[in-house]
Amino acid sequence: MVKINFQIKKKKSNGPNFIGFDAVRVSVASPDQIKTWSYGEVKKPETINYRTFKPERDGLFCNRIFGPTKDWECHCGKYKYIKYKGTICDRCGVEVTESKVRRERFGHINLAVPVAHLWFLKKPPSRVGILLNMKISDLEKVIYYAKYIVMGDLKDRSGISFFARKGMLMGGEDFNLFKYGINNPIVKEEFKNIFDGIVCEEIKLDSNLTKALKQLKVLVKGQADSAGISTEEAAKKILENVKKGDIYYKVYFKPHSVYYYIDLDPSSHGEIKKILSEKFEKSSTVSITETDKKIRIEFFDIEKDKIYNDLRKDSFALKKYEGCLRIEILKNKIPFIENFSRSDSFVLLEESDINNIQNGFGDSLKVNIGAEAVRSLLEEINLDDEMKNIYAEIKKTKSDAERARLLRKLRVVEGFLNSQTRPEWMILTVLPVIPPDLRPLVALDGGRFATSDLNDLYRRIINRNNRLRHIEQLKAPIVMINNEKRLLQEAVDALIDNDSRMRPVTGAGNRILKSLSDTLKGKRGRFRQNLLGKRVDYSGRSVIVVGPNLRLNQCGIPKEMALELFKPFIVKELIKQENITLRSAKRMLERGDLKVWNILEKVTQSHPVLLNRAPTLHRLGIQAFEPVLVEGKSIQLHPLTCSAFNADFDGDQMAVHLPISLEAQLEARVLMMATRNILSPASGRPIAVPSQDMVLGNCYLTKEKYGVVGEGKVFSSVSEAISAYQAEKVDLQARIKVAGITSIRDKNLNNDDEQPDVTKWKNCKSEDDTEIINYTTVGRIIFNEQLPKNDDGSYALEYQNKSMTKKELVALVDRCYKELGQFKTTVLLDEIKRIGYKYATLAGISISIDEMKVPTEKEKMVREAKTKISEIEKQAKLGLITESERYNRIIDIWTRVTDEISDIMFDEMRKEETKAYKPGQNRFNSIFMMADSGSRGSRQQVRQLAGMRGLMAKPQKKLTGGIGEIIETPIISNFREGLTVLEYFISTHGGRKGLADTALKTAEAGYLTRRLVDVAHDVVVREEDCGTVNGVFIGTLRCGDEIIEKIDERVVGRTALDNVVDIVHDDLIIKRGELITPKKAEKLVEAGIDKIGIRSVLTCESGHGVCAKCYGVNPATGEQVEMGEAVGILAAQSIGEPGTQLTLRTFHIGGAASRVVQRSEVYAENNGTVNYYNLKTIQNKDGETIVLSRNAELVYTEYPVYRKQIYQIPYGAVIKIYDGQTVEIRVNPITGMKKDILIAKWDPHSKPIISEFDGTVNFVDVKDGVTLQREKSKITGQIERVIIEHSSDRRSPRIVVKKDDGSVVEYPLPVDTTLVVRDKDRVKSGDILAKIPQEISRTKDITGGLPRVAELFEGRRPRNVAVVSEIDGIVHLVGPTVKGNVKVEVENPETKMKKSYLVRAGRHLVVYEGDRVKEGEALSDGAINPHDILKVKGPKEVQEYLVNEIQQVYRLQGVSINDKHIEIIVRQMLSNVRITDSGDSHYLNGEIVSRYKYEIDRKAIKGKKGKAPIAHSILLGITKASLSSDSFISAASFQETTRILTEAAVSGQVDYLKGLKENVSIGRLIPAGTGLAAVDIDDNNKFYSREQNDAND
């Protein structure tokens, strides 16, 4: 790779330096700060004068405030031109400056009343609410002038706090008691003293007080009985006694209980004290010190449950004589009183209540309303004291909910302290007005104006503000003023966030106006529309056409477009050459002089342009080319770049961009040129490879044909053979021999006179036993002449003596790139393209309906299939197989028939090639050639043309692939024969499915890419080697028995973790820290090594980004990754791009179902030895050996090569070859064919439940209509007994086998199980009791795949989660619980540790009694929750699980993505930890912090010998991980913009600009690639890049 260093000298300027800073902070602005930004107050709602069209003074577009509308000219015209720069006009007050200041200058509005900022008030969690401990609903009542808030404690004359406590909100109904108490003239005087003493404070009463209060009730009743009076009068008498003793009587309420207590004034105990002490048992006494007065309180309690009725009666007396207290013990009336007892609650007062209270209390009740009240309360908060209090409360509290609330509050308080801001600034007193050019007013034709919505919203605010000032001066009624204040609050709300209001402000046509929040958030918001993606100058757009004559580094640009794009360069050159003025040069351009075209040729010669095709899904969506001027108006594109751009020539458009600066041109040429983009960044395989016509041409050129002119000729040299072809003596495809390429003399000739028999020219063996083709064709010679050659003229990649299909061409290009480098590959590609097109034209290949050969055997095969199916239907009717088995077997039969017909059809077509040529006949079958060469169409499509259309997919319901996902009636016809009406109707299902998927899933794939980019954009290669000793172990990847990916494919391009040694030969294959090349990977396979340790980004210890050693080779270049490579974005694009491609690919096959056919037997193909592991077996009555273990493994060791093959043997399989047995393959002496030997077989469609003992069957909880359903199969008509889901928790269907010795064995029956035996049947060991259907008819389709990928990347809990074992051990099934759940115990025999798990009723168990399980292994069916793997096995295992699961989805589609891309995303998902013990750190328990920060702090605390914090890894989904990014600019530009900015502002967050998005947003070079010349990360998170150092110089 080329390393580029730029040294740029910048001109010094006196303006603000937008580069020389290293962080951005956002915080809440103070009113003074807003005023310092402002250039004047906006006082009027006017915009521009309707006659002069000039801005109005003091209006929203005022020139005096915001600057002049014309450059260097004041409003009145007194001062014009630049010479008056900086002068302020004495007439109009406008400064003479440039008009662009109208984009920068703010104004402000002085609000007549404070107004709450909607973000801090309503964006959950409400910051104002958190600080004041208030509910958002209560806050809104105050802010929107519905209720008053009490600003100070209300004291009575004795200094005791009254009901009204500071911060309480008071409302009407609740305070009638005040009304009655004060305004009722009868009781006003009489009970004045009592009223003065009413107190309501929370006092914890002892539980033993019931006795005393019970006696108070007895006292009242006793007095009534002895005196023969009513209880009302008795209560009145007690009150009079209290009055005489001048003792205050107090009452305290709670929702369900009432406590009476007596407050005795020490100065006058009086008579009542004596009565009480005689009659009552004293329960407790409390002393309160208040204003140097000691008050003793003695408590008497009334039993709460029994007192209601009596007290209701008594309450009338109390109400009558104590009008100020409404003692109504009614449940619906009491709850409001609860508020009075809590010191942190708020009681609302309505207007009427305030007046009544103030009549009685004068000014001692301080209340307020609106944002002003809230601002006052916020002003009183002392943040330091508040913080101490919160810490103290956190230590005391035991409630998790309370702790969470306190932590939220602490975060807010800490934020204000750190950012040195005040909470009251969240309430606005000064409103900034944004610059007028950011909310323009544009004149349209016909005297109309188009205006930004913000102007309307500002106008409403100014109007209401001015009106409020006016009515306040008029001394209007308070109701009117409050209403106007509310309207002002609503107007400001609408400006800040119109969308989140209940009734948004609308404009003309009921359109919701766009507020400031709307201009920031969403796709059309400031972040995503203007900061992350900008429109650029020097660009054009046109339709693309193919440019077959272009070289790979060229593109054709229309002359007219080039003239416009290169205008400044042409003008510069004209001025230089012709020595003319700028105006003359422009005139020459417009005229189109001949000189202009000559200059255009010159300036475009060495100036690359960038071509881009939308959607740009990966970095190959923008590539650089050298422009070639072409006639017409279309851009010409090199055909080999089509696959990278995903372009075709059916009307696609592309954009052209012109790099202006020398640096940009250099980067375009060195890094982005199409010749440098031959490999795909996703897989490292070539992407610029021949396709379609080019493949067809090369395939035709290199094919051979019997019976053509010149067959069997022998030539002395290549040139002689070509001359003969040109003289038409030899055909292009004739088999010939050429000296230097093939052997000349045939081994079968006896003498020189004999003629060679060309039909015997077959492949023969050379001396070293390798296979060679002992003939060639002129076409192959011509093809090989285009290949790169060595200096001595020999072929650099040896002679390619074979038919060149697409697969062969890709392999050739790949090999050329790896062995000969980029330059020779580029030349090779252009040559392949040239001859491909040439010979595709000469071949004149086209499609003919006669070439669609329908196999003659088709009818017979279909007939046989139908016979087999009718046999299966009969078996199903007899109940021998289940409905599910019937369906699966039918699908299997049709799948096999379709494949067989397709094979026969292809063989028929292939035979045409081997027939001798006769003039007037076709040489080859064009359709076969297209499909076989890979130029157009697939086997599947050709099968549908001439074979049989096959099975179709239904519109999908189950993602897993359930029964009925494939329509079981296939389309037997093909397109050549034509479909019947029914078949056509069935096929429309599939066709529509494809189209619907395309539309819906493209958006989903695009969104996935966006989330991936957001989570990984800051992962950049920042150092050479992080020095870690950790890594991951990878080997051959298997899915069941099938090898998915071999070890050599997986480890190429990685760094070895340790030395890798061939133990047999004691050779060092790979050194520690060395890159693994393809050759070294081959040596690994030869040495039989199945697993090695490699460095991985998952274990990389780089603080920011990753290191080059852990990343390894860059797939896009095939070389070690360079410093500054943006590997995170590369990873996101590599995963997201195929997602979109796959989505678009479903409909090309027209919905024909391609099905995964399940393996159901294991055959030995070569001699070898059989070994089993974890095997437990039993013999059935037929003498067959049945497998009883769930995780049995068969290892087949072939000899003499000692190659091991591993197969999973499922429960219920029948074994034919036993452990340790040797297998020898016999060869049929007549046919010479090997006969494979069957080792084991099983039913792939259902899992049996097998009896392990002889005994009698008993059904438990198997009840007809409850847990058992007799289903009549719709197709077979046979009755099946199926276990169904049941509502009763207590039933758990199971089969119990009673052994002859009386002991019993239980077998749980999951839902959908089909019973095979009947109750009370006698069974033998090995007999099948029941069958569980297996849903295996999955169709290969990304529809199920994309949601699965998203689910894994989001770390979501799957819908049906499997129960996972947390320890290694042996399984014991304890049996069903009361609710029908199955209890599974896992016991470790070594440690004796035991764990129990409950498997929900109806879930399938995947383990059986006595099975051995490993930790993290599933006990029940369902998807494994990645969070469980993390908890049980740790980060490494969850990483491996996620990478493999995601890869599985893509592999099913045949998409190749390098593991390291997925690893990078998974690394980001695990880049946070949760604190479990804060130790001596500043962290709080439960807090989520970045792993890097945590490790730094941990080391620092350990270094100081402190107690280090403890944390555990957590898995965050990509969306959560993006939003928890350290950078608020990055997070805000992703999602939830307003919430992120609110949070950032309150906590005064600092963005250190480490990632890519934040630097793009503020317009700096990104810290990646050439923008990362020198990175220095110090402990303070400071971050310096080259450009900043330049700026500082």
From Swiss-Prot:
Assigned EC number: 2.7.7.6
Give GO terms: molecular function aspect only: DNA binding; DNA-directed RNA polymerase activity; magnesium ion binding; zinc ion binding
Q: Which pairs of positions does the record mark as disulfide bonds?
A: none
For biological process, the GO terms are: DNA-templated transcription
Q: Which residues bind Mg(2+)?
A: D648, D650, D652
| Note on cofactor | Binds 1 Mg(2+) ion per subunit.
**Record Pfam families:** RNA_pol_Rpb1_1, RNA_pol_Rpb1_2, RNA_pol_Rpb1_3, RNA_pol_Rpb1_4, RNA_pol_Rpb1_5
Supply the SUPFAM superfamilies for this chain: beta and beta-prime subunits of DNA dependent RNA-polymerase
**What's any one GO cellular component for it?**
DNA-directed RNA polymerase complex
Q: Which domain of life is it from?
A: Bacteria
* Residues reported in the UniProt entry to bind Zn(2+) 1: C74, C76, C89, C92
Query: Which keywords does UniProt give here?
Result: DNA-directed RNA polymerase, Magnesium, Metal-binding, Nucleotidyltransferase, Transcription, Transferase, Zinc
Tell me the cofactors it needs. Mg(2+); Zn(2+)
What InterPro entries does the annotation carry?
Answer: DNA-dir_RpoC_beta_prime (IPR045867), DNA-dir_RpoC_beta_prime_bact (IPR012754), RNA_pol_asu (IPR000722), RNA_pol_N (IPR006592), RNA_pol_Rpb1_1 (IPR007080), RNA_pol_Rpb1_3 (IPR007066), RNA_pol_Rpb1_3_sf (IPR042102), RNA_pol_Rpb1_4 (IPR007083)
Binding-site positions, Zn(2+) 2: C1026, C1100, C1107, C1110
Top-level enzyme category: transferase
Spell out the reaction equation it catalyses. Answer: RNA(n) + a ribonucleoside 5'-triphosphate = RNA(n+1) + diphosphate
Q: How does it assemble?
A: The RNAP catalytic core consists of 2 alpha, 1 beta, 1 beta' and 1 omega subunit. When a sigma factor is associated with the core the holoenzyme is formed, which can initiate transcription.
Q: Which NCBIfam families match?
A: rpoC_TIGR
The record's PANTHER family line, in alphabetical order, gives: DNA-DIRECTED RNA POLYMERASE (PTHR19376), DNA-DIRECTED RNA POLYMERASE SUBUNIT BETA (PTHR19376:SF54)
Tell me the function of this protein.
DNA-dependent RNA polymerase catalyzes the transcription of DNA into RNA using the four ribonucleoside triphosphates as substrates.
Family from the record? Belongs to the RNA polymerase beta' chain family.
**Record's protein name:** DNA-directed RNA polymerase subunit beta'
Q: Could you tell me which species this protein originates from?
A: Endomicrobium trichonymphae
- What does the organism's lineage look like at the top? Bacteria, Pseudomonadati, Elusimicrobiota, Endomicrobiia, Endomicrobiales
